[in-house]
């Protein structure tokens, strides 16, 4: 199954790739040519692929996404809800890599 090519503006590319996820799990899968990014809830897989390829000048093999529901938390008797989040696990083609410790 191939993803269709999507044309997105330069500004939208920076909106889609919000931040890399720097965790122990993210660094472990980084050794296998995968990178994790926080993305907006409305971002699609083809948009994420186009944004990563455009910003980092790499070839993307696959994009997997996951949505996390925000937890309900109490603070001083007030009930609040954390925001829902979406992450994208981007698999890079052989020979390509992204150093997430440097800025774009």
Curated annotation (Swiss-Prot):
Keywords: Ribonucleoprotein, Ribosomal protein, RNA-binding, rRNA-binding
GO cellular component term of the entry, any: ribosome
InterPro entries reported in the protein's UniProt record: Nucleotide-bd_a/b_plait_sf (IPR012677), Ribosomal_uL23-like (IPR013025), Ribosomal_uL23/eL15/eS24_sf (IPR012678), Ribosomal_uL23_CS (IPR001014)
PROSITE patterns per UniProt: RIBOSOMAL_L23 (PS00050)
One example of a Gene Ontology biological process annotation: translation
Record GO terms (molecular function): rRNA binding; structural constituent of ribosome
Cytoplasm among keywords: no
Keyword tRNA processing part of the UniProt annotation: no
Assembly, per entry: Part of the 50S ribosomal subunit. Contacts protein L29, and trigger factor when it is bound to the ribosome.
The family this protein is said to belong to: Belongs to the universal ribosomal protein uL23 family.
Stated role: One of the early assembly proteins it binds 23S rRNA. One of the proteins that surrounds the polypeptide exit tunnel on the outside of the ribosome. Forms the main docking site for trigger factor binding to the ribosome.
Stated name of the protein: Large ribosomal subunit protein uL23
């Amino acid at each position: 199954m191939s993803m269709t090519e999507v044309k997105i503006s330069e500004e939208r590319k920076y909106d889609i790739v919000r931040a890399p996820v720097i965790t122990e799990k993210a660094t472990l899968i980084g050794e296998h040519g995968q990178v994790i990014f926080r993305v907006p809830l409305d971002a699609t897989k083809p948009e994420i692929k186009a944004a990563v390829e455009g910003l980092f000048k790499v070839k993307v093999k696959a994009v997997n996404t996951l949505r996390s529901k925000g937890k309900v938390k109490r603070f001083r008797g007030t009930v609040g809800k954390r925001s829902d989040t979406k992450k994208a696990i981007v698999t890079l083609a052989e020979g390509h890599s992204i150093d997430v410790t440097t800025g774009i």
